[in-house]
Amino acid sequence: MKKVITLLALMAAAQIYAQGQECINLSENECHRNSSCVPVNFKKCCGDQQFACYEGDFNSCHYITKCYKSSKSLDVIESTNECYIPPAGYELFEPVSSCTNDELKHCSDQGKQCIFKRNDCPNPTSCCPGHGVCEDFNRSESGSGNKEQISTTGNTGPQTRGFTISGTGGTGSVPIDACTNVLCQQGEHCEVDQDGRAHCYVNIESIGTLPLGCLNVVCQPHQHCEIDKESGLAHCVLDINPIGFTTIDASSTVAGSSSTTGGSGGTGSNDICSNVHCPDNYHCEMRQDGKAQCVADINAIGFTTSGASTNGLIPPASTGWSDVCSNVICPPGYYCQKNEQTGKADCLNYSSSTTGGGTGSTTGSIDVCSNVICPPYFHCEKNDKGWAQCAADINAIGFSTSSTNGLVSTTGSNDVCQNVHCPQFFKCEKNENGLGECVSTLIPL
């Protein structure tokens, strides 16, 4: 028996090692389709986008921008996933978007001012926005476009992926022709980037009301961004009282109190869900056959979209697309469309697109799952609201319900399992607490 256990352990270790080696050798498309592998994008300063594939999943490998600098060549690499493994000799560092204190002092000692010159290249990165140079005071008054920034204070810290927070020194003059037809979202303003293109930036005064980690997060309707206190990561959670859905904190002793944590019991338009308790990151919905079903929350932790510039979302075939959008870069999760009433460019949220008229009208169809990467044992489906949703595979080996969060109960019938829908290979049984529980029908190995 011991030999059998040892042999099984060796086979498992060999399989894990083989999976890791397999990920490294996969193409980008193959890596996206393999649930055991994580696709990672990275690039050097002003370089082209590159790709690598590592073993892991999106529960442990989160999208986050990190900057690495070589101690020998001073080369810089920007990666967008925390599981990226840099080459030997590369270390983490924080870039600056204004003159450093040393550069300010150096220029001041020469009787000059420090000008932060942004890198002039086709593919700039937030890890190497530019550098400080010393120039005479009267030279900057003639202006040199938006690629120069006069600094009178220390550095303003690194840029956030998808957004740029302008410092107190500003980012230079804004040409009128680039921002004239740009209408930014609330809390943003239009500026011109180093390529002369209009860009919507977060207002500096908005920082006090929005966590920094949420600045590059676009949530679905009826959700908002919060920072997890334990991990420090940003994630989308349900609003306390979205239309037609109310979450209930079962542990609260105050009547009518609510909570936005996962695993909530949903009430509102569907009475059948009033006493159904779903696992974390799931909510209750009534199926067409009248049964209650726990459905994965949109954009739950572990649900990610690929791509760097637009979070992997593809702009729909829109009406009114014209030259007013040619110089507009919208924030991640948004696309540009001409407003027929004002003639200006609107940055619209992908999730707000409808099939009717108006500013957000669209034609054609969108494959909402085309760039969605789901966790292991999950697949992407288009739900009845038209959103991409990661749904559990009904026949995935290893998929099971939690002993505590997998409990469901119903009212209106003596049979607690009458309106409970379990995955394939699971059946509903009444447990010792009198609640319906989804129990596996498979025989353990």
Swiss-Prot record:
Residues 1-20 form the signal peptide. Pfam families: Dicty_spore_N. One of its GO terms (cellular component) is spore wall. Induction: By cAMP and the MADS-box protein srfA. Keywords: Repeat, Signal, Sporulation. Residues 141-161 are annotated as: Disordered. Residues 141-159 have a biased composition (Polar residues). One of its GO terms (biological process) is sporulation resulting in formation of a cellular spore. The keyword Metal-binding does not apply. Residues 21-139 form the DSCP-N domain. Residues 178-201, 213-237, 272-295, 324-348, 368-391, 416-439 form the Follistatin-like domain. The keyword Transcription does not apply. May contribute to the structure of the coat at the interface between the middle, cellulosic layer and the outer, electron-dense, proteinaceous layer. This is Probable spore coat protein sigD.
